């Protein structure tokens, strides 16, 4: 009887596996498994409404946070006979009477873009071009809704819709930039607008970048396909831009203000070293005061200065100084309100929130414990409630919390996994996005006490589709290395997994500072972070594993910052230790373990394959930095200081370790990668040649760091699969 039951169960399992639909690479790259989103949510200040662009892009509509139902159509391209069919973005004026509408958006770098802007009057339904000039950037309303500031060709302009005033005249490509960041500040400080209005719209302050002494990097461009750059049909061309590499000259930055009424420009006397940074300028509640953020080049000190935009006088408000470096998130998450400044800091070893009054006096630490604040949503100044996301329950879990003025903290979300929030402009409601390893995104509308009002989207259709493909599950696990370090990870096994067999393993990792790949969250991406590509590899018969080593986020400053001054050393050791641990499992073939990664993950792949212990049979490195001297100042020096200060640390790189490389290696790089230049792979390939090492390399014409466009991504993924199949099966 037992044999019969076992036979029936086995037969049913095999039949289920055979009946399941098979993944192919086209499914992955054609967005077949893309989740449905409640996207483009822009809360309307002071209300419980939000605005969003319609699916076809032709309308901008307001909805209720509470009900999710449409309230009114704010803009209709057809109704106002707009000279365009779809909208790429918009901004409501502070008084709610007009809108800035942008179309014909063209990307420049990761966050920057040009567009054509229009001013739309909601009551009269009239539509006017913002400016007759082209290539406008970051158009922004003044607080009094009377003016719009924008950038064109590196110069600042102000217009009221009728008269246009050019605020700066010295802007020039690759020399002087006004009001938008240079490449490295945009990329590493995460912003694309370097100006702000004062509280009543009578002054405009901006950051000026003099990049004339920054060295130029040139990317070679070819005709290519999809799209074809026909200007390079016969001869290749170049795109040259300023890119400061570690230890080299940065842009010289300064802060300026323009008096709108007087038409006068004044330089602000904000203290700053000649090689320092101004990563933000923000509005303050008083029209005669604004806030400038400054950092030293080592990035271990952040200063907030209050400055008078009319006189240039500046006063230090807050000084934040922590061991090793101030994390980028501190700049991004700091909130300046009417009466307060909310500052994140890991000064006590974990990222927490600190509340100051507007003059810089510390009121209190908002919350504390051995966990991390992982996002900041803001503060309701009427109630004193502060809303944030945290890993309070586990480094791999994210929940939404409120910290009340009386010092108590309340959890607003319930399901374990990954929770995020968007709050209404009056903080009465929020949209909660939840997902887990096994469940795609669920969007709910909730009250500010966490009560679910309604489910907006549950992605049941996607969940059913995934079930038809019989995806495996991401199984979390932990182990302790030979150095006594506890590491966490997940693995995906083949659906027909048999514990009595020996399976090949592919380790995917990113491993970069503060990054987390091991989180209880949904992913269907095509870059190996627990998404569809991992399930495809499992379908091919591999166990796919991801482990976050030392230097990654979610576990406090000691764990994250221990890689300081020696990027790649501990990270590689932890990936090798992962392979050794996996090789000891009864169902793993220790002689068939591979590793791959992208960007920092590509770097760590090379470092791991040359760590000294030959545990990897094969590896794939995509767009890797191979020597930190080739990467930009802001990112590299944050973790490594300069090559002049840390020569030994910079020698910890794949090129210096090339003689130790073991395993079959495939390298892939986009030829137009403006972030991690193909120079990195060129130089490493030359080192491999001189070391007489066999390898394979593939370059993607005119593709950037994401290697996307045309058939590029599908081709790349197929090369990765083929490489592991050819070398590990």
Task: Tell me what each language-model feature is.
Residues 69-101, 106, 127-137, 321-324, ...:
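Blade-loop segments of beta-propeller domains
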Residues 51-57, 62-64, 92, 99-111, ...:
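Beta-strand C-termini and the immediately following turn/loop, strongest in propeller blades
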Residues 111-158, 163-194:
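Asp-box/WD-like beta-propeller blade repeats and closely related beta-sheet repeat scaffolds
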Residues 28, 287, 419-729:
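Serine-hydrolase catalytic core recognition
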Residues 31, 68, 104-109, 113-116, ...:
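Predominantly five- to eight-bladed beta-propeller fold
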Residues 38-42, 53-60, 72-74, 88-91, ...:
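Non-catalytic accessory segments flanking enzyme active sites
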Residues 65-68, 121-125, 160-163, 259-263, ...:
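Short loop/turn segments that connect beta-strands within beta-propeller blades
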Residues 36-41, 85-91, 180-200, 280-281, ...:
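Signature of short aromatic-glycine-proline-rich micro-motifs recurring in repeat-based ectodomains
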């Amino acid at each position: 009887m037992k044999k019969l039951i076992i036979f029936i169960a086995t037969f049913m399992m095999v039949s289920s596996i055979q009946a399941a639909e098979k993944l192919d690479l086209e499914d992955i790259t054609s967005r077949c498994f893309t989740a449905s989103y409640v996207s483009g949510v822009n809360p309307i200040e002071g209300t419980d409404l939000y605005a969003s662009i319609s699916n076809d892009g032709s309308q901008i509509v307001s909805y209720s946070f509470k009900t999710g139902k449409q309230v009114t159509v704010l803009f209709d391209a057809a109704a106002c006979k707009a000279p365009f069919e779809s909208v790429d973005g918009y901004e409501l004026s502070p008084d709610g009477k007009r809108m800035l509408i942008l179309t014909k958006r063209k990307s420049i770098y990761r966050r920057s873009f040009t567009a054509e802007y229009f001013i739309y009057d909601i009551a009269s339904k009239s539509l006017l071009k913002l400016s007759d000039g082209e290539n406008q950037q970051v158009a922004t309303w003044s607080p009094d809704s009377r003016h719009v500031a924008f950038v064109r060709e590196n110069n600042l302009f102000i217009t009221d819709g009728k008269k246009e005033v050019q605020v700066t005249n010295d802007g020039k490509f690759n020399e002087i930039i006004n009001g938008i960041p240079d490449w490295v500040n945009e990329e590493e400080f995460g912003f694309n607008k370097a100006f702000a209005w004062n509280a009543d719209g009578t002054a405009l302050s901006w950051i000026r970048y003099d990049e004339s002494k920054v060295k130029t990097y040139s990317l070679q461009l070819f005709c290519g396909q999809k799209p074809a750059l026909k200007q390079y049909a016969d001869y290749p061309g170049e795109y040259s831009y300023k890119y400061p590499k570690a230890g080299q000259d940065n842009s010289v930055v300064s802060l300026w203000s323009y008096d709108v009424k007087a038409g006068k420009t004044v330089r602000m006397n904000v203290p700053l070293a000649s090689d320092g940074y101004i990563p933000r300028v923000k509005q303050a509640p008083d029209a005669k005061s604004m806030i400038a953020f400054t950092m030293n080049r080592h990035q271990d000190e952040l200063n907030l200065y209050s400055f008078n935009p009319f006189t240039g006088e500046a006063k230090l408000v807050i000084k934040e100084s922590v061991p090793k470096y101030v994390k980028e998130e501190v700049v991004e998450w700091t909130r300046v309100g009417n009466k307060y400044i909310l500052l994140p800091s890991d000064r006590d070893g974990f990222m927490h929130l600190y509340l100051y009054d507007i003059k810089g006096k510390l009121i209190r630490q908002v919350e504390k414990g051995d966990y991390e604040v992982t996002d900041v949503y803001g503060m309701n100044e009427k109630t004193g409630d502060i809303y944030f996301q945290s890993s309070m329950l586990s480094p791999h879990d994210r929940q939404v919390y409120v910290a009340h003025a009386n010092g108590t903290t309340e959890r607003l979300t319930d399901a374990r996994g990954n929770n995020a929030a968007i709050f209404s402009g009056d903080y009465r409601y929020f949209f909660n996005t939840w997902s887990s390893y096994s469940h795609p995104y669920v969007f709910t509308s909730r009250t500010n006490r966490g009560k679910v009002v309604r489910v907006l989207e549950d992605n049941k259709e996607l969940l059913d589709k995934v079930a038809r493909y019989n995806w495996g599950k991401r199984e979390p696990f932990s182990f302790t290395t030979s150095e006594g370090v506890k590491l966490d990870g997940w693995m995906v096994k083949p659906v027909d997994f048999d514990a009595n067999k020996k399976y090949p393993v592919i380790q995917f990792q990113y491993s970069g500072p503060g990054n987390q790949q091991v989180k209880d969250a949904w992913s269907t991406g095509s870059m190996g972070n627990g998404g569809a590509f991992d399930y495809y590899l499992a379908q091919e018969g591999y166990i796919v594993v991801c482990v976050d080593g030392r230097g990654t986020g979610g576990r406090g400053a000691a764990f994250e910052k221990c890689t300081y001054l020696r990027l790649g050393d501990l990270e590689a050791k932890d990936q090798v230790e992962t392979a050794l641990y996996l090789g000891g499992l009864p169902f793993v073939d220790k002689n068939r373990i591979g590793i791959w990664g992208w960007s920092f993950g590509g770097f760590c792949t090379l470092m791991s394959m040359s760590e000294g212990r030959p545990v990897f049979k094969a590896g794939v490195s995509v767009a890797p930095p191979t020597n930190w001297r080739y990467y930009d100042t802001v990112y590299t020096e944050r973790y490594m200081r300069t090559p002049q200060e840390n020569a030994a640390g910079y020698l910890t790189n794949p090129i210096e370790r090339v003689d130790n490389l073991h395993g079959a290696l495939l390298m892939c790089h986009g030829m137009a990668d403006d972030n991690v230049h193909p120079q990195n792979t060129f130089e490493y390939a030359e080192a491999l040649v001189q070391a007489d090492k066999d390898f394979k390399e593939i370059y993607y014409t005119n593709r950037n760091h994401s290697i996307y466009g045309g058939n590029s991504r599908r081709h790349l993924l197929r090369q990765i699969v083929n490489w592991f199949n050819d070398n590990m099966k």
